Amino acid sequence: MAEVSLGMLIDIVDEEWMRDTLPDDDLPLPPVLAVKTDDTEETNQETQQADAETWRDLALDTQ
């Protein structure tokens, strides 16, 4: 439900739409984005590689 400025409530979606769900998609992730589930010791090389590709420009100097 959503409230209009006059205080009336309107239906945005119907009951069938509210019960509907999206299917779970099994999408393959690149190895860099895959979640590591094991507790083995690994080098920090993969983390550093991902950090090197991170965009850091916040454009704070522009107006």
Swiss-Prot record:
Role description: Component of the anaphase promoting complex/cyclosome (APC/C), a cell cycle-regulated E3 ubiquitin ligase that controls progression through mitosis and the G1 phase of the cell cycle. The APC/C complex acts by mediating ubiquitination and subsequent degradation of target proteins. Regulates global growth and development, including phyllotaxis and apical dominance. Required for pollen maturation. Promotes (pri) miRNA transcription of each MIR159 genes.
Family recorded in the similarity comment: Belongs to the APC13 family.
Record note on disruption phenotype: Abnormalities in shoot and inflorescence development leading to the 'bonsai' phenotype characterized by short, compact inflorescence, resulting in reduced plant height, disrupted phyllotaxis, reduced apical dominance and production of clusters of bracts and flowers at the apex of the inflorescence. Reduced seed set mostly due to impaired pollen maturation and thus abnormal male transmission. Defects in mature miRNA miR159 accumulation.
Organ and tissue specificity: Expressed constitutively in roots, leaves, stems, buds, flowers, and seeds.
UniProt source species: Arabidopsis thaliana (Mouse-ear cress)
Pathway: Protein modification; protein ubiquitination
Protein name, UniProt field: Anaphase-promoting complex subunit 13
One Gene Ontology CC term in the entry: anaphase-promoting complex
This protein's record includes keyword Nucleotide-binding: no
